[in-house]
């Protein structure tokens, strides 16, 4: 409750700052600054036929499904919340060097120590001038355009999905683009601690260098193709003075290929096929839903009995967004993540997750959306034969708002 009160106070402070900024915006004139205020209020209600970690009651994450029978109690739960609701401000300010672009964006979905809470959470705090950008925003290693038109919050588990602190250089901008960035190492999308699988007492993970990421997107008439990559260095130190030497290091790497293919329809919006395939080692914290980056390997050496190994991971995403008309749409698809566990990992360690959904959404008027969605997820353990399924039906209603102050 204390953390929730702190989060609410922080949110109130940001609201005060927002209104002060709005009061300072000058009347509309040529070349004047501009603020775009936007967001939405969103209600989620649904029924979960199985069970999962109660801290993640309103999302479908295969890693949070039970690792053994009735780990989280009995099956069947009703859930509801407004945690997807969002508030953001984008600023545009002319300077002698070009236009400064900034984004501050928050939502109410608590993660990390606030997992399960309705509390303010920072999504973006990012600024850009010319070909350089800095702050917290989408990692160049990910492609946000792969995310389907769905109402389940967490999204496809096999997708690379991470808003990270970074400094980026963008030599090519526009529909065809190129980005190179150095990123904060060791963080994760759900703000949990970095997990190396070497949590023995006295063994501490260290990141001597930032992660290096890059993307190149080539646009064409029907969409685009994007290739992204990442390199990272992970080290762990043995801080206990004994007969064992548990120090080590590993290089992590990954390649992510993604695409959107647009299909003309009679509706105002085009249908879209969204595809992604990623493979790498030691990059699990960049995935939308995956466990440890480093696994334990038993060596048989009396001095170094265990070592670390960057775990290979494969992620796939395939979704189709279809517009029946200007007022009705459907999204359906499948995603999976496959981890190759190390020999020293427990039999009930997470090895593979599946995710699928189908929905029918209705847009009665501009800025209003409502609809229902069926969701399915599955967890498969490493070596004990255990699988756990989850089935959900969710209804959501979303009300957008936006307003521009200043500008021409």
Residues covered by each model-derived region:
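Sec/Tat signal peptide C-region and signal peptidase I cleavage site
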Residues: 25-30
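Bacterial N-terminal signal peptides that target proteins for export
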Residues: 2-15
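Sequence/structural signature of outer-membrane beta-barrel proteins
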Residues: 48, 94, 109-113, 139-154, ...
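Bacterial N-terminal signal peptides
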Residues: 13-23
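Outer membrane beta-barrel
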Residues: 31-57, 63-64, 68-189, 206-224, ...
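Outer-membrane beta-barrel "beta-signal"
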Residues: 388-408
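Detector for outer-membrane/organellar transmembrane beta-barrel domains
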Residues: 222-350, 407-408
């Amino acid at each position: 409750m204390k953390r929730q009160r702190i989060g609410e106070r922080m949110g109130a402070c940001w609201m005060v700052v927002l209104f002060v900024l709005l009061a300072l915006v000058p009347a509309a004139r040529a070349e004047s600054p501009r603020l775009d205020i936007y967001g939405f209020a969103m209600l989620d209600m649904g029924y979960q036929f199985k069970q999962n970690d109660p801290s993640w009651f309103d999302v479908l994450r295969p890693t949070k499904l039970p690792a053994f029978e009735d780990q989280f109690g009995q099956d069947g739960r009703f859930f509801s919340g407004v945690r997807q609701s969002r508030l953001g401000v984008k600023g545009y300010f002319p300077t002698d060097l070009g236009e400064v672009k900034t984004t501050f964006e928050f939502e109410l979905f608590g993660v990390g120590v606030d997992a399960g809470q309705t509390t303010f959470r920072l999504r973006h705090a990012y600024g850009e001038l010319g070909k350089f950008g800095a702050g917290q925003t989408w990692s160049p290693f990910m492609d946000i355009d792969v995310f389907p038109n769905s109402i389940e919050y967490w999204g496809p588990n096999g997708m690379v999905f991470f808003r990270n602190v970074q400094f980026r250089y963008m030599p090519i901008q526009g529909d065809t683009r190129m980005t190179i960035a150095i990123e904060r190492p060791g963080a994760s999308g759900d703000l949990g601690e970095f997990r190396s699988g070497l949590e023995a007492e006295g063994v501490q993970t260290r990141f001597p260098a930032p992660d290096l990421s890059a993307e190149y997107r080539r646009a064409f008439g029907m969409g685009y193709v994007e290739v992204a990559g990442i390199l990272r260095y992970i080290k762990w130190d043995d801080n206990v003075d004994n007969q064992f030497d548990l120090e080590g290091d590993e290089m992590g790497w990954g390649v992510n290929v993604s695409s959107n293919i647009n299909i003309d329809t009679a509706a105002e919006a085009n249908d879209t096929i969204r595809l992604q395939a990623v493979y790498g080692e030691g990059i699990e914290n960049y995935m939308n839903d995956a466990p440890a980056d480093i696994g334990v390997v038993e060596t048989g050496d009396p001095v170094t009995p265990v070592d670390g190994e960057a775990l290979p991971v494969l992620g796939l995403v395939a979704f189709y967004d279809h517009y029946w008309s200007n007022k009705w749409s459907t999204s359906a698809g499948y995603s999976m993540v496959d981890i190759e566990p190390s020999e020293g990992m427990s039999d009930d360690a997470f090895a593979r997750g599946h995710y699928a959904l189908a929905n029918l959404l209705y847009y009665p008027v501009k800025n209003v959306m409502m609809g229902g969605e069926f969701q399915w997820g599955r967890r498969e353990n490493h070596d004990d034969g255990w699988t756990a399924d989850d089935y959900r039906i969710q209804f959501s209603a979303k009300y957008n708002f936006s307003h521009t102050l200043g500008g021409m």
